[in-house]
Structure formats: structure tokens, C-alpha cells
């Protein structure tokens, strides 16, 4: 039996894409329709995955622990030596605008900052470059009631990601490949093990109920600190 998985199918056309993402996005200081958003092919986020992101869940149009999510966002930016382009109150205004412009009460607000557009492809940081700042929102997909009642299946795999998983970077190819291992076998998630120790799922934190207690792997550079878990 195929277990439930979050919606990830490709939209059939631009109109459907706009319904799935929202007609309004934020890009470099401007709110604009999705079809008008343009990013350079020389952007370091495109060439090197040189950027970080954050996802903020929104319930009934109220962002959940938004300050804590923005603090984690800032830590990720510091971790890749990229100055935060906005103060927290500016980020809050971006989140508010995106949330109010979208048709869904429950949403996932996606924020991303890359090191920006360079004039060539070269690994060292450019001397002067303006970060690319992007934001969008999507409907928040939650599991059906029957799935919450019976759970889902998962497979384990060796954690082959890099050594700074505590930073929420856009370099997610290892996560993509590892999760696909589970999807190919009909599982909802792939749980990762590093040297025999549980770290996390490819797209989830792991909490275990053991002898009446809620336990989790200890915080480390191999685990993204979960805002909800805190």
C-alpha cells in the first residue's frame, strides 16, 4: 500500500502553479506577480546553492513561532558568512504581506537569501555583491486524520549529508536523493543514521516516545535545530 505523502506533483500549467504557490511573491524589495519574478542565471544560489532558507508555518493566518524561525534564519546566514539583508521587523512585514495576499488560512511561508549575482562563476565570495532575497507562500498540507491515527512507514539510510546540517542551506541534493530512496520503496520518509546514531529525517525532526518519555537526538552540527521541537 502506498502511504500518504505530502503533495509534490508538478503543476499542469502556470495558472495551477500560481494557485499552488500564490500569485504574489517577494523579490529584492518588491512584491510582484509570480510570472514577473526574474533571477539571474549567474546568481550564486543557482550556480553553487550558496544560500539559506526558512519555512514558517501559518495557522489561521497566524505565523507559528515566527520570531524563533527568523532567529534560526539569522543563525544560518551567519553560518555561511552572509549578512542578514533585513532587520526582524522588516522580515515580519514581508511575512505579513505574503500571508495576507494568499487565499489560504493555513500556509507555509518560504524565505530564501542567496549570496547574489556575480559577473562570473568563481568559488570565492565576490568582493561586492547584493544578496538575492525571495519569499513566497504555499498552502500548508497536513496529513489526513486516518494517517495521523495509524502513522506512516519509513526506511533508514546512512546519513551522507555534509557536516553542517545545523544550517538550513539550499544545498539539499543529499536530502533529495535519500528521501527518494524511501519514496521508491513506498515509504513516507527516510530516517538517517550517522555512524550508527540517529540524526533526523530528510525533511523532519525525530522524536521518540520511550518508557513514557519524549526523547530526541542531542543537538549537534549534524541536526537542524527544530523550532517546533523546542
Language-model region placement:
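Glycine- and Gly-Pro-enriched alpha-helical subdomains that act as flexible
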Residues: 197-219, 225
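Conserved alpha/beta cores of soluble small-molecule-handling proteins
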Residues: 2-190, 195, 220
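Feature captures the catalytic cores and cofactor-binding loops of soluble hydro-lyases/lyases
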Residues: 226-230
